[in-house]
């Protein structure tokens, strides 16, 4: 059964929800959070910190793009299930999709640990949202809150924070971007924040902002990523899991090449990953 409803992570209205092939799972497709699945087969989805999950999906989510169908989606099902299902997909044994496991440990490792890290990530993301230098940027409210790492929920009981406080958090971050000269334009929200047609901006990145982006890209902002190339199949699942755990315990983030959509070819996305990682592991 398909339906349109509100995204449980970011609050975007009118998103796609699907409950069909697995009665214990719910699949969502949101323009802000991308494609993701909650599974009730374990308690992983209950352990997710939504204050970290919303930015994670906004920055790292899988979305269909013009001229390209995205098969990947995040899932709270076990790593073993996701890996096995992906093997079947690649071997044409199912016609569905390619699940990529996510849990709170993965999200927490990704989440920025300092204010300056957040600022750098925001600037890089704003640049990714543009097609050309100097393009003006408008963000709907769910996108703004996720982009600015706004805490939507109180820590003790998951009660939602009032709209007034959400706006205050978001504008604090954007005001700093204006103050240090990284962006210019209109630093305000247009319309009632509770309305679906309200939006932030328009803003654009300044020459100083682009200079900072160049510095970050040269510094290699993916330095915590380890790209892993290995034989992929059910017989390597235990080894794969051991490699993932070892990389995580060392404080890094494992990216397996099969989790990067490439269809057997060196695509721009895959080539970009190879260029930007500090460590490439071949097994």
Could you say what each language-model-derived stretch is?
Residues 7-11, 30-33:
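Short cysteine-rich clusters marking metal-coordination/redox-active sites
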Residues 14-15, 34-37, 200:
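Cys/His-rich microdomains that often coordinate metals
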Residues 23-37:
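Cysteine-rich micro-motifs
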Residues 39, 185-216:
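Accessory beta->alpha helical hairpin/"wing" motif in late/C-terminal subdomains of nucleic-acid enzymes
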Residues 43-162:
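Short amphipathic alpha-helical interface segments
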Residues 160-180:
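Short amphipathic alpha-helical interaction segments
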Residues 244-270:
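Conserved BB-loop
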Residues 273-283:
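Conserved beta-strand-loop-alpha-helix hinge of the TIR/SEFIR fold
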